[in-house]
């Protein structure tokens, strides 16, 4: 199986209206058409979960919680897994995103978030500050590999928060005063569902309190097609400033 290669039929006018109003869109597998076999997607992710700490290739990030050293994320996948490259950077996701936003896009970050049992949550935040030096505007596709539930720490959004000037405190978190009275809505997903959201969505995650993994594949896309090499610059910078567990020596030009 390969990722879907025929042009995406597009999203509905209602989908576009919902996305513009709320800042996110949830699509089931039969609607998004990014792949045709969930079992194959899960097999690809199973393969990647076995990748070791090799040098100069993919990048593993870990977290320590309750005395356990847990795989948190694996980035820079596409060079080493052709089906995953097609899934994230092929015609289907780019056509889907253009149908939703009217814009052409280029991928600049690719990863799997593992969210293993016991994995940590995240305080309310925006993704924009972390990447704004590279892309002031971007959009993310999250593909649920496993079920995403309240119990295992699914994403929670404040709908419509992308329209607000959300204040960010010095530590990078959303200012506590803004959070007063805000309702975070859980993004409960079935395996194979897709969640699309933009850089300015206020969101949080709870810890995974179950004995089951809650993995997802992420593609992050910017809108400036005059910078097709932005992904290379991003990962060169990230290697220097946020090195992975399998840190290695690469010939890179640090982007500071």
From Swiss-Prot:
Binding site for Fe cation: 125, 127, 203
InterPro entries to which the protein is assigned, alphabetical: Phytyl_CoA_dOase-like
S-S bridge residues: none
EC main group: oxidoreductase
Pathway(s) of this molecule: Alkaloid biosynthesis
Cofactor (UniProt): Fe cation
Coiled-coil parts of chain: none
Reported biotechnological use: Loline alkaloids show broad-spectrum anti-insect activity, and different lolines may have different biological activities. In vitro tests of NFL, NAL, NML, and semisynthetic loline derivatives with long carbon-chain acylations on the 1-amine have shown that many are effective against both fall armyworm larvae and European corn borer larvae, but the effects seem to differ depending on the modifications. N-Formylloline reduces the weight gain of fall armyworms by deterring feeding, and does not significantly affect corn borers.
The EC number(s) this enzyme carries: 1.14.11.-
Triggers of expression: Expression is induced in loline alkaloid-producing cultures as well as in planta.
A Gene Ontology molecular function term of the record: dioxygenase activity
Keyword Transmembrane helix: no
Keywords, comma-separated and alphabetical: Alkaloid metabolism, Dioxygenase, Iron, Metal-binding, Oxidoreductase
UniProt GO BP: alkaloid metabolic process
Function: Dioxygenase; part of the gene cluster that mediates the biosynthesis of loline alkaloids, potent insecticidal agents composed of a pyrrolizidine ring system and an uncommon ether bridge linking carbons 2 and 7. Lolines are structurally differentiated by the various modifications of the L-amino group and include norloline, loline, N-methylloline, N-acetylloline, N-acetylnorloline, and N-formylloline.
Oligomer status and interactors: Homodimer.
Entry similarity comment: Belongs to the PhyH family.
Name of the featured protein: Dioxygenase lolE1
């Amino acid at each position: 199986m390969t990722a879907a290669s025929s042009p995406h039929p597009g999203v509905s006018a209602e989908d576009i209206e919902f996305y513009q109003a709320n800042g996110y869109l949830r699509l089931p597998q039969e609607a998004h058409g990014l792949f045709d076999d969930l079992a194959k997607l899960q097999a690809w992710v199973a393969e990647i979960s076995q990748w070791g700490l090799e040098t100069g290739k993919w990048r593993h990030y870990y977290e320590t919680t309750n005395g356990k050293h847990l795989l948190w994320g694996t980035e820079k996948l596409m060079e080493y897994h052709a089906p995953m490259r097609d899934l994230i950077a092929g015609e289907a996701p780019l056509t889907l995103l253009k149908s939703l936003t009217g814009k052409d896009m280029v991928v600049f970050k690719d990863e799997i978030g593992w969210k293993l049992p016991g994995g940590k949550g995240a305080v309310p935040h925006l993704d924009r500050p972390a990447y704004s030096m590279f892309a002031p505007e971007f959009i993310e596709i999250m593909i649920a590999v496993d079920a995403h539930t309240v119990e295992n720490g699914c994403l929670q959004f404040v709908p419509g928060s992308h329209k607000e000037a959300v204040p960010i405190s010095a530590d990078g978190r959303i200012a506590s005063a803004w959070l007063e009275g805000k309702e975070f809505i859980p993004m409960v997903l079935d395996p194979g569902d897709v969640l699309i959201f933009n850089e300015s969505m206020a969101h949080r995650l709870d810890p995974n309190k179950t004995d089951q993994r809650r993995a997802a594949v992420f593609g992050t896309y910017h809108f400036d097609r005059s910078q097709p090499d932005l992904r290379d610059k991003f990962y060169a910078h990230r290697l220097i400033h946020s090195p992975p567990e399998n840190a290695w020596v690469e010939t890179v030009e640090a982007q500071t």
